[in-house]
Amino acid sequence: QAVYRDQWNNVTNAYRTGSVNAEFKMPVGKVNDFITVGAQILYDRAGTISFTTTHILPALNYHKSLSSEHNRYLSLGFMGGWVQRRFDPSKVTTNSQYDGGGLGENFLNSQYSYIDGSVGMSYNSNIGADPNNNFYIGGAYHHFNRPKNNFYRNATIELHPKWVFSGGLRMGVTDFAYITVQADHSRQGG
């Protein structure tokens, strides 16, 4: 899957985001177990100072079949990789410059990188005999390694872990129509 988006083009140097995601399914062991291997690559650039974020995050997931007769899986997944953020300090304008002063900011670095990691688990199953009726529930813990997240090299500023809980239900109404309900809840920081 590939996605590209321009946002707010009437603003100087609008947001430009590109993303490529891929996942490959491979059977493993007996019964219906399988693993998926994938990656998420994201590039985002915004604003006059060219604030840019790049993510390269490979993923590995194991899906354990809990029934040979029904579609029931318990899944465990890991995603982690490299993230970089940067900007062009020559394009920064601060209030000190309007008063005849210099930049007024002490940027030791105009870029930084870190390793980020996430883990998640989900359960999905058919409802009844119809394989088109199903549900899922899951949870994920993002940024479990608490990477440092700032341009000033301040060791106390970190990306706080985030919990995400998800659930969904799909039920057939007719042979050609379904009702789908999904919900997510996330919590990050304190």
What are the functions of these language-model segments?
Residues 1-190:
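Subset of outer-membrane beta-barrel
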